[in-house]
Amino acid sequence: QHSRFELTGSFFNPGPYSGFLVAILPIALHYTLTGHRIARILSGVVLVLLLLVLPATLSRGAWLAAITGCGIVLSNYFHLHNRLKALFQKHKLTVFITTICIFFLVTGTLIGIYRLKKESADGRWLIWKVSSTLVTSHPITGVGFGHFAGAYGEAQAAYFAAAERSAGEELVADAPETAFNEFGQITTETGIIGLLLFLTIIIGAFKAARHSNSKAATGMVGSLAAFLVFACFSYPFNVLPLLVLFTLLLAQCTPMQPGSRWLSGIFYTFLFLPVYFLATGQQEREQAYKRWKSEQIYFNMQIFERTVDNYKKLYPLLKDQPAFLFEYGQCLSRTGQPETSNLILEEASQLSADPMIRNIMGKNYQTMKQYTQAESAFLKASRMVPNRLYPLYLLAQMYNESGQIDKAITTARLLLEKVPKVPSSATEEMKRDMQKLIKDIQ
């Protein structure tokens, strides 16, 4: 269980946990309505448990997904489309008034859901807004698979540098690893081409399920629809169990078609080859992860002279991990290798939106007396996540060290005016240091 959350299941976070629950809910409802006696009883028990647990996760996206998935199952079971069509033909005025009432009810419900965790919703809206600028600048092929976070950090820095933004936007800004919308992330990373391929797979699965004779087809369609609605507000493709569940739902929606054996053999051979090549390299990579975790003990103890050499050996296997690159860059910085450190940290910045990467790069430039580059790094870190005080703190100190007194005072005053997102003893200490800096200079 996560220390910040009371209900996480085995997912360490209520978000993915609620996604797992909501993907099962429509299937449980379907079998409760259509299953045989034992299946109906077991499915009913599961359904009740899911309905009890799901509200406690406080996942608004999961609630909307549950309504969508269960709505599909209920609509099919009670033939609501035909009934509503007949009702509309007989009582047009009544249906019209009822529709208006339902519209206002849904609108009020959505507003209530938004206000439930307003700051979280505003933060996701900012992520989607900034992500849209990446889609605009890289519409066809995207920024590259796995490069969302790094590209997002650059885009958010450009967004806050371009114009004066509201205090509310500055307060909710953060350094996300995902877009909190899988459709948006797919488009950002792989462009319109990737999105169209993904939509083709989804539409194909729905069409196949529609023409399927399977009794479970409706439940699977409801679950897949619920999963996709949840994917509009979260990051299920970044959680392996949910990615496996999504694959299984796609497979269940697409029944096997009879075909020639040799074609099937060729298909499975090509399917197996990438799995084989990936699996053969995993053992060495797993050992590298274990060595990294053991070396982190010395890293946290700040024994950098020992750690830096071992990190260098692990670099070829873990150079796609931004957390490892950040630690390796710090080790190089703390062992008197600022130039090499910045090369490693530049790689990390391509994979992560964390402004601390730019802060360390700025300190490295400052060590090398390259004050212009240091200023650029600190300013970018400040614009990436404007509610953080540390980049401005480092920038003011750098200005003071380099003799840029006016800029030092201006930056120190700017920091004192800032309201930190999470006040702490560290932020209070930084403000005291800035007050002292201004007093000493003047």
Where are these regions (language model features)?
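Interfacial juxtamembrane loops and adjacent helix segments
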Residues: 1-11, 145-188
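Alpha-helical transmembrane segments of multi-pass inner-membrane proteins
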Residues: 1-5, 9-93, 97-114, 188, ...
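Hydrophobic alpha-helical transmembrane segments in integral membrane proteins
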Residues: 109-123, 268-302
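Structural marker of alpha-solenoid helical repeat scaffolds
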Residues: 317, 350-351, 384, 418
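TPR alpha-solenoid repeat register
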Residues: 324, 357-358, 391, 425
